Amino acid sequence: MAGLTAVVPQPGVLLILLLNLLHPAQPGGVPGAVPGGLPGGVPGGVYYPGAGIGGLGGGGGALGPGGKPPKPGAGLLGTFGAGPGGLGGAGPGAGLGAFPAGTFPGAGALVPGGAAGAAAAYKAAAKAGAGLGGVGGVPGGVGVGGVPGGVGVGGVPGGVGVGGVPGGVGGIGGIGGLGVSTGAVVPQVGAGIGAGGKPGKVPGVGLPGVYPGGVLPGTGARFPGVGVLPGVPTGTGVKAKAPGGGGAFAGIPGVGPFGGQQPGVPLGYPIKAPKLPGGYGLPYTNGKLPYGVAGAGGKAGYPTGTGVGSQAAAAAAKAAKYGAGGAGVLPGVGGGGIPGGAGAIPGIGGIAGAGTPAAAAAAKAAAKAAKYGAAGGLVPGGPGVRLPGAGIPGVGGIPGVGGIPGVGGPGIGGPGIVGGPGAVSPAAAAKAAAKAAKYGARGGVGIPTYGVGAGGFPGYGVGAGAGLGGASPAAAAAAAKAAKYGAGGAGALGGLVPGAVPGALPGAVPAVPGAGGVPGAGTPAAAAAAAAAKAAAKAGLGPGVGGVPGGVGVGGIPGGVGVGGVPGGVGPGGVTGIGAGPGGLGGAGSPAAAKSAAKAAAKAQYRAAAGLGAGVPGFGAGAGVPGFGAGAGVPGFGAGAGVPGFGAGAGVPGFGAGAVPGSLAASKAAKYGAAGGLGGPGGLGGPGGLGGPGGLGGAGVPGRVAGAAPPAAAAAAAKAAAKAAQYGLGGAGGLGAGGLGAGGLGAGGLGAGGLGAGGLGAGGLGAGGLGAGGGVSPAAAAKAAKYGAAGLGGVLGARPFPGGGVAARPGFGLSPIYPGGGAGGLGVGGKPPKPYGGALGALGYQGGGCFGKSCGRKRK
C-alpha cells in the first residue's frame, strides 16, 4: 500500500507542469481521456494526452475519431487500474473520475459490482454530463476540468481550466486535445458543444454551404469578407441570381468581371424587360400614363439606368398622336359652328336667310311650296277673301311692278306672304312678274286718260263698260301664271286712283271730260279683254265695274258693288281676292312698263331691305304697298290729305315730302311711271273712305281742272317726279283720316256732305280740294312729265288742256291718229303698246274696240 500512496501525487504534479507548457490551438479542444498515471499505471514519462503513449495504464489507447475516447472495457479495471476516464480509485481525492475524493469507495478495481458495475457507473456518469478524463472534482476539488468553481483546466465559468467554453454547460474539461487524429473535424469558433456532445445549431456558424462566410462576425471559408446577398439562395440545384454569370466573386460590388447588380436589370433567363418605375410624372418614364390621364408625364422614350428599358418612344409617339382631348369647340356644337345663332341677316326681309345653309334649303322649299300656294301674309289687312292658295295671283308686290297708278292689277293683293318677316323669294316673284308683264300691263281702274261719263277714273273706257275692274286681261292671265310662284304682298293698293272717286273727277267734275268706263269692255285694252276674262276666271278676278263704297260711279272705291273695286268691294276682281282685305295695285299700266318694272324689281329684291314693319317684307313699316309709306295711305303719297302725290303729306318721292326706304328698286320702275296701289287695310285712307275732310287732297288735278298748272309746269313737274321717284316712294297715310267726305262717297260723301256742299264744292275739290289747290307740284313733277305724271285727276301722262279736258297724246289717242285708236291705249309713259300684227285699232296697236280673241294676240 505504501508504494501506491507514494505514487499517487505524481499525476497532480504532472498536470501542473502540463498547464504551464501546453497551449491549445483552439479553445474547446477535443475532450480526451484523462492522461496521467492511474493507479496501477506506468508512472512518469512525457506523453501527449489522447495519444495513448505513456502515463496511462496498460489499457490506455489513442482517442477515437471525434475526440471520444474508447469506452473502457470491464476487464481493464483492476489489474492495471482504471482505463481512460476510469472511476476514481481508493485513494481519497486522488482518484480519476467524475466524483471527487472517490465517491465510490474502493481501491482500484474493487468497485462494488465488479466489472459490470463499473461499466454501468461509467455510463451513468457520462449521461450526467461528466467529462471523460476530467481530473478535478466538484467545486472545491483540485481536479482538472471540474465543475464550475473547480480549479481544473477547462472548467465552467469561474474555473481556471483551459479548453472549456466560457459559460458552457457541463463543458468537458481535461488537458487533452493536443493531438488531432486523422479525419478529425475542427469546429469553428462559437458556442461549445452542448450536452451530449452535439454541436449548436446557430445559423451562419459551422454550417458550410448554407451561408458561406455568413453575415455574422467572422470570416467565411470560401468568400472571405463577403456575406451572402440577402434573399439570394445558394447551394446545389439553385440557380444563382447574382448578375454577371456567377463566379467566385459574383455579387461583390466592384469585384469580378461584371460587378454588382444594377437596378432595373433583369436576372436569369428568360430575360423580361423590367417594369420601369413611375408613370406619374417622374423624370424618365415610358411616357404613357394610365387611363389616358393627361398630365406632365416624363420624357417618353428614355429608359432608366444603363439604357436597358422598354424603349417606349414608338409607343409614346403613337399615343401622342391622339393625345389628351381638348376642352371642345364652342358649347353646343362641338366644332360644328356657333350654337344656334339667329338666321342670316336679320331684318333683310327680301332675302330669306341669306348666308345660312338652312336659308338655301328653306328658300328652295319655300319656292316649291309657293308654287302650290303660300300661307297668309304679314301685313295685317282686312278679312279679305282670297283665292285658294296664295292670295291674289300675281307678283306685283315689288316696288315698280305695277307701281304707276293704272299699272297695278291683281298684284299684291291680300295677305299672301309666306310666313315670317321675309318674303318667299323676291327673285322668283320678280321672275314671274317679268314673264307676266310680257303679255301686257295690268288693266283695271287706273286714272282714266279719257273718260266721258261717270266713273271716269277707272280705265279708259268710253261709257260704263263692263270690263275687268282693276285687272288687265293680259295681266290677269299673266298673274294667274305668276301666282304659281308665290303670293303677293299684303296691303297693296287696289287700283290706286282708279275709281277712287268714281265720277268725281272725270265725269263728275266737268273739267275732266269723259264718262270713263271700267277697263274691259270698250277700253283701250279691249283687245285682251276676252283672254283676260278667261284668265281672271281662273285667278278669281271677274269682269266688273267696281264702285266707291256706297259708290256712285263705275269702278269706284271699296264698298262699291262693281267688280275691281278697292278692298271692301263686293265683286271679285278686286285687289285682295274678292273680299275686303288690303287693296291691290290696280291701275292700267302698259305692257312695256310692267315688263321693265318687273325686270327692275328682280334687281330690287336685294335692296328692298328697309322697313320691316307690318308692310310687305323688306318694304315700309306700315301696311302700305311694299317700299312705300308706312301709313295706310296710298303708297308714297300724302300722309293725310290727299290723293297720291297731291296731298299735303309726304307724297311720292319727288311728289311729296318724304322718301320711303327700300324704294331703290323703284328707281327703274319709276322710269315708266309711279307705283300704284292704295296700301293700308281697308282701302285708300283712314276710316271713312278715301281722303280727309275737305275732299281729295290739296291741289287741283292737272288737266285744267281748276287750279291746274300750265302745261309746261306740269311737264317739268312730271319729269322731276320721275327722277325723284328713283329714290323711293315715301310718305305715310293716304287720302286722309275721314275719307273723301264726312261719311264717304255715299249718302254723306259725294252727295250732300261729300263732293257737293262739303265735298268737291266749297270745301272739297273747290276751295280746299281740286279747285284752288295746286295739284301735282309743277316743280316736283318737272322731270316726271317726261314719262307721264302720276296722280289722281292728273290723268296719267296728261298735260293741261286749255279749256278743260286732257290733250291727246301717245298711248291715249282719241282717234286713229294716235296709237291705240278708239278710247286710247295702254301707252303709259309715252310708249305705245306693242302691236301684235294687223291693223288693230286703226293703226295696228292693241286696244281700241278689239275684244278677246279678235285682238289678234298670239296664243301661247
From Swiss-Prot:
Secretion signal span: 1-27
Residues the record lists as Allysine modifications: 123, 127, 299, 318, 321, 368, 371, 431, 435, 438, 481, 484, 534, 595, 599, 603, 668, 671, 719, 723, 783, 786
GO biological process annotation, one example: outflow tract morphogenesis
Modified residues (Hydroxyproline): P84, P383, P410, P415
Residues with 4-hydroxyproline modification: 35, 72, 105, 217, 230, 233, 253, 346, 399, 405, 498, 519, 617, 626, 644, 653, 661, 702, 832
Stated role: Major structural protein of tissues such as aorta and nuchal ligament, which must expand rapidly and recover completely. Molecular determinant of the late arterial morphogenesis, stabilizing arterial structure by regulating proliferation and organization of vascular smooth muscle.
UniProt name for this protein: Elastin
Organism: Mus musculus
